[in-house]
Amino acid sequence: TRSLTNFIRDKGAPKGTISNNNKGDFNLKKLINNSIKWPGLNGLDLAKIVTTKKKYLWKGFKTWKKEKGFEKNKKKKYKIVAIDYGIKKNILRYFSNFNCEVTVVPCGLEAEDIIKLKPDGIFLSNGPGDPAAT
C-alpha cells in the first residue's frame, strides 16, 4: 500500500481497471479500453458528492481515557466549525477529546453563514478528488 501511495503522490493517479470474474474469463481488450477512456481525476469536484447535505452538531463518541475507557464528555470549551470536504469520523473524535463542540457544515456553505455560528475555530477537512477543483 505504501508503494502505491508513493507512486500516486509522485506521478499522479494511473489509469487502471480492477475486474472480477469467478470463472476467470476476462475481455482484456474491453478492460484496457475502459482504462484508456477514463478521463481521470483532474478537475473533478468529488467533495460536492461526499459532503454532508445539511449542517449538524457532531455527537459521536465519548472521550477515551487510557486505563478508564470511555468517559462522559465534559462541557465543551471550544466551538469548531468543520467544513466537510469528505471528513473522517476519527478527526471529529479528536476534536471531541480536546473538549470541542463540532458543527459540521457542507462544503458549499457561504462564509457569512459560518461566521454566524460564532466559532472559535474553523477546520477544513481533507477530501477526495482534485484539490484544485474544490
PLM feature spans:
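Structural motif
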Residues: G121-S125
